[in-house]
Structures are given as structure tokens and as C-alpha cells.
Amino acid sequence: MSELNKIALEIINNGKGILAADESTGTMTKRLESVNVPSTSENRLLFRETLFSSSSMKECIGGVILYDETIKQTSSKKNKIPDLISSMGSYPGIKVDTGAKVLAGSPNEKITEGLDGLRERLKEYYSFGARFTKWRGVYNISKDYPSKLSIQSNAHALARYSILVQECGM
């Protein structure tokens, strides 16, 4: 069995799931400020460290999707965040797209960006401990959408993403 297959099966073993903890700094700021906590790098780290240290992690979570800021952070106990996640029996993952933008030629639809420089980012993320990735494909669904342009554009982006990710061992 390939390493990628092994990881995929272990992430969902015994009914475990994936924790999406890839909130951007902006989203984390909104969450923390809603409870009157300043959104500093330290407070965002403490929030995530508490989440990743929970006793429920080992029982329920097989993989954790991280944000660029988080995968590079070190916990208060001087452990790298991906190492903390691994110590709890989960695989660290990383969100690698850079957002959805308006699709040229179809202003009511989106295309996911982030392919430029992806190979280099993937190698870096792998060295930090990431073993799987997340990429969003955004489609409007209605009687008029998705358009052929959107389907083809997003399929092409997803195919390029998939090849690069597998090439880098994730």
C-alpha cells in the first residue's frame, strides 16, 4: 500500500474525521474579538494549542487542516504545532489554495487560485510536517451555472493541484 493510501485510511480509521483549523488571520480575529480577546499571534496560538491538546483529539480526529501561520508556529512547550498534532495521533495537513476569485469571462463564477509557486510551498509544508492538503473548488449551482468555462477551468486547476500534491508526497 502506498504511503498516501496509508495516511488516507489512518485519517478516517475508527470513524475519525478531519478538523478544519485553517482559519485565516482575519477569521480568527473576528472569533477572538467576539469574546473580547485581542487577536495577537500569541492568542491565536493559545487558542489552537488548546484545541490541539484536547483529550478528544486522539479519539475523534485523524487529521487537522492548518493555515500557513499555524504550521510554522511553536507551542508554549516549545513543540512545533505539527509535532503536537502528530503526538495526539493525528496527521497535520495544510490549506494550500490562496482563495477564490472571479473567473475571467464569467463574472458570476469563481476560480480557485494558488497554483503559482505551489510546488515550492508544498515542499516547505512537507518539511514542516504536513502530510495532506486542502484545496477548494467553488461552483455556483443553478439553472444557468456552472458554465462549461467554469467546469473546465476548475477541473484544470484541480488536476494541476492534484499532480503537484502527489509529486510532493501529500
Language-model regions, residue ranges each:
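Alpha/beta catalytic barrel-like cores
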Residues: M1-F128, I141, S150
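Helix-rich catalytic cores of soluble enzyme domains
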Residues: L118-M170
